[in-house]
Amino acid sequence: MASGSRATPTRSPSSARPEAPRHAHHHHHHHSQSSGGSTSRAGGGGGGGGGGGGTAATATATATESVSKAVAQYTLDARLHAVFEQSGASGRSFDYSQSLRAPPTPSSEQQIAAYLSRIQRGGHIQPFGCTLAVADDSSFRLLAFSENAADLLDLSPHHSVPSLDSAAPPPVSLGADARLLFSPSSAVLLERAFAAREISLLNPLWIHSRVSSKPFYAILHRIDVGVVIDLEPARTEDPALSIAGAVQSQKLAVRAISRLQALPGGDIKLLCDTVVEHVRELTGYDRVMVYRFHEDEHGEVVAESRRDNLEPYLGLHYPATDIPQASRFLFRQNRVRMIADCHATPVRVIQDPGMSQPLCLVGSTLRAPHGCHAQYMANMGSIASLVMAVIISSGGDDEQTGRGGISSAMKLWGLVVCHHTSPRCIPFPLRYACEFLMQAFGLQLNMELQLAHQLSEKHILRTQTLLCDMLLRDSPTGIVTQSPSIMDLVKCDGAALYYHGKYYPLGVTPTESQIKDIIEWLTVCHGDSTGLSTDSLADAGYLGAAALGDAVCGMAVAYITPSDYLFWFRSHTAKEIKWGGAKHHPEDKDDGQRMHPRSSFKAFLEVVKSRSLPWENAEMDAIHSLQLILRDSFRDAAEGTSNSKAIVNGQVQLGELELRGINELSSVAREMVRLIETATVPIFAVDTDGCINGWNAKIAELTGLSVEEAMGKSLVNDLIFKESEEIVEKLLSRALRGEEDKNVEIKLKTFGSEQSNGAIFVIVNACSSRDYTQNIVGVCFVGQDVTGQKVVMDKFINIQGDYKAIVHNPNPLIPPIFASDENTSCSEWNTAMEKLTGWSRGEVVGKFLIGEVFGSFCRLKGPDALTKFMVVIHNAIGGQDYEKFPFSFFDKNGKYVQALLTANTRSKMDGKSIGAFCFLQIASAEIQQAFEIQRQQEKKCYARMKELAYICQEIKNPLSGIRFTNSLLQMTDLNDDQRQFLETCSACEKQMSKIVKDATLQSIEDGSLVLEKSEFSFGDVMNAVVSQAMLLLRERDLQLIRDIPDEIKDASAYGDQFRIQQVLADFLLSMVRSAPSENGWVEIQVRPNVKQNSDGTDTELFIFRFACPGEGLPADIVQDMFSNSQWSTQEGVGLSTCRKILKLMGGEVQYIRESERSFFLIVLELPQPRPAADREIS
């Protein structure tokens, strides 16, 4: 979309736009209206010139929109929170419907702050575990603890009877050393965890209470004041069983992930349905749902798996405020949230009075639900819940981590929510496994969403192309009267064109008098913009909205000229919404007041009664593109200029067809700018001076250089590394001449603080950009980022034989190797691995590879990397080998290591798996091996070169003798025939001398061969060519058919005679060798022609056909002839070289196989002989 295409949203002062609702069964539920109004999205005036800042503008507008929505919702959430709190204090009940209809009152900053603090620092936990907060220093001082800590740890006075020989249990008190609460071995584990950089990757620790040795899962995370330790009682006394349980949970998750990955693409519904089935199977909850958050922040249940006797919630929509923004923020931090029993009394957290604010429980697995959430759950019959965030990437491959460790590119797409009708608590390892499953779901979903977006873009582009086509053939009314029509461009219930005072409606639309009223309102209230979109005409301030009723609620309009308009209409949302849940019964008197899914749905329908589905950004972009196309069509007509697309009775005058084509191109060009902008590959363009005039979002992201900064910079001088300068200059000069090169690698600089001095490698295709008169006006580069592949070589070292022998071999070519036992513990870590990571064998063996070795010791880039690694290890243990899996981590010193991981199953003799064996492919080891291979190749080459040098040297002497003998014969008296034979012999000798000079072939390969041109007789050339084939023809008893006109024999030409001879002789001899010996023949046909050049000179064209009957050349020789690098036959090498020489002389060759014969077709262009004065070696 062209830059500046969306105006600042306009809001009618009176319009209080209720947010479309959301219904959720977790976290803090509040209900309300959102302030806001219709969004007036105006299409901007300008087209999308080179590089178009268009998408940047769109993306920014979208981002700004979502931020403003979130901020508005924070205000509402805070106000509702206050209402709920007051209702409790005053003894009244919280009235759902009343709160929804209450007029919005602005919340003060203190109110919002208090609300956030109450949610994040509520001071209570759930009673199924206990919480400690410990100072993050050597003292391990207790800063806070939950009131149930002493009981759960068996440290209350009534748990033990003091005796003379045993010390009294340590008290759980502020300031006490937390290590004393646990067994000595557990204290050591805690100390080690506190020393780790990424403390949470070690979760869960298996620790025991000091007095009773009761086992706990300890889940640790760092906060502003220290480390929070959540202790959840473990169900078994044996740590081995606990580890087995954790590994089993991971295996189940990996199995589910593998099934997700095996699903056919292009079906998001199937993906969501599969996820709910797997989660229910893994966790055993009564109901599992996928919630999706829509663009306007309201939510919908899109998939469900439930116990048969439960009411279905599939298709339910609920208000945005059902899941407050604060909760959504928390889900990005803490992606899995369990409430074990909503009826359980929360436990208070006692904390050090010296702490400035209540303890932050954001990351705690035990944080108590807020009162209104517990009430909501109880109302809907859900006693326990498990909620998991579904996070997708909102753009960009590399996660740039922002504050709080959250990637700025991450977006909360929705939630997977589990409900149970009785208390339910699932152990931490299983929740952790579910988190992995969610990450895999997010990755898969992201791919599906991108695919869906591309398909929708393609559909829109196809429709736009067809609409353009109509505009060019007919009057503009064709876009409403024919198929496809403007209704096919975006999802709508009706559309209309108002053109030259006439109304052309389609589908569900206002009447003509109503449309005139709307146009008058647009002129008065929105006359200064170029369009408007709203999901509620009533909220937008249109007074006639009530008369339109439910049929027309939403409208998008594009102004073409001050008096011509395009409209799209949508009916109210409710008709789109289907829910299989129970309807509201009149006898449920309190149904509207209680917080319940049915009330949420009812509230949602109430809010959207006079509202349509919102217009999405992509839809507005499509409308805007069509607006620009039409504006071009109408503008000249309105001005009445001579080059207009003036429309006379629906027919366009023929003389204007060409200009119409130009206008169509400019429109399509604008649309192309939008597609280039949103492309996922780097695209950039330069003008004829080599300065940037196009720079899409992907290249901006890769280089760290924004569109604005890149524009006008010199590609060669400012943006590439010195080593690429020559390549790029050559690329540019060739493309500006119309010669387009493909697959050229260039090295671009990166910009911005973190990226300075970095480089990205891009393989580009250069395309000449032309204007409508076909003049080249610049160069466009379409690229592919290969930076990752560049770091790692392509080939793997194939390793066979005994593991131990390989692992402990000191040979530097042995790659870094590590191994896993069946429980994912590290069982091997070789010397190369120690060198690569900086961690010694003793430090890592026995530790978990997932989360501990790779995660805590060797940090990974983001949680998705850990999920992918987990899938590889578990599958390898289970018997599925992986090859060349891209794997990156930070070593002990923080250096980023990129590698390829190969993982194989380790088996006993009986085939039973005992773990996985992994090795990393690092560029340096690969390069060493490549050098070794290169050295061996060089040795071979040197031996060949010696042989070749010997032949070239020794052949010169007899050639010299032949030349001398020829010169003696020339001085004797010869008749014409004898003189002809002598000239043919001399021509063959000179051809041979040239070939000997070519021994290295380098000049032919790189195109630098110097052609020695002079005037020559074509008759001499043909005699020399035929003479070289005569012996073989006689030997094989083949008939030679010559079809050479006399004018060819007498013709003169200008070029390199002996090269032409060499090439023609080689192709002819190939035919002689391939002809069948029984009744065989070979035909030589030559035809002359003359081609006139644009500068007035003539070029002679010679067309040769060398044919023989039957199958002709063997397939491998033909393949070799057209190959540039790999040959399997000697004859093929010769033909390939001749093909290249022919190309250097401006000729070309084709090999054609017909049913009864095969032939070479050779076309050679030669200039006519120059005047004598000009002749020289060129």
UniProtKB/Swiss-Prot annotation:
Ranges of residues in domain GAF: 267-449
Keyword annotations of the record: Chromophore, Photoreceptor protein, Phytochrome signaling pathway, Receptor, Repeat, Sensory transduction, Transcription, Transcription regulation
Biased composition (Gly residues): 42-55
Xref: SMART domains: GAF, HATPase_c, HisKA, PAS
Binding site for phytochromobilin: 372
Record bears the keyword Repeat: yes
Domain PAS: 668-739, 802-873
Ranges of residues in domain Histidine kinase: 950-1170
Annotated coiled-coil segments of the chain: none
Post-translational modification: Contains one covalently linked phytochromobilin chromophore.
GO biological process, one term: protein-phytochromobilin linkage
Region (Disordered): 1-58
GO molecular function: phosphorelay sensor kinase activity; photoreceptor activity; protein homodimerization activity
Compositional bias ranges of the Basic residues kind: 23-32
Ranges of Polar residues composition bias in the record: 1-15
Transmembrane segments: none
Gene Ontology CC terms: nucleus
Annotated family: Belongs to the phytochrome family.
Subunit structure: Homodimer.
Alphabetized NCBIfam families for the sequence: sensory_box
Function field: Regulatory photoreceptor which exists in two forms that are reversibly interconvertible by light: the Pr form that absorbs maximally in the red region of the spectrum and the Pfr form that absorbs maximally in the far-red region. Photoconversion of Pr to Pfr induces an array of morphogenic responses, whereas reconversion of Pfr to Pr cancels the induction of those responses. Pfr controls the expression of a number of nuclear genes including those encoding the small subunit of ribulose-bisphosphate carboxylase, chlorophyll A/B binding protein, protochlorophyllide reductase, rRNA, etc.
Protein name (record): Phytochrome B
Species annotation: Sorghum bicolor
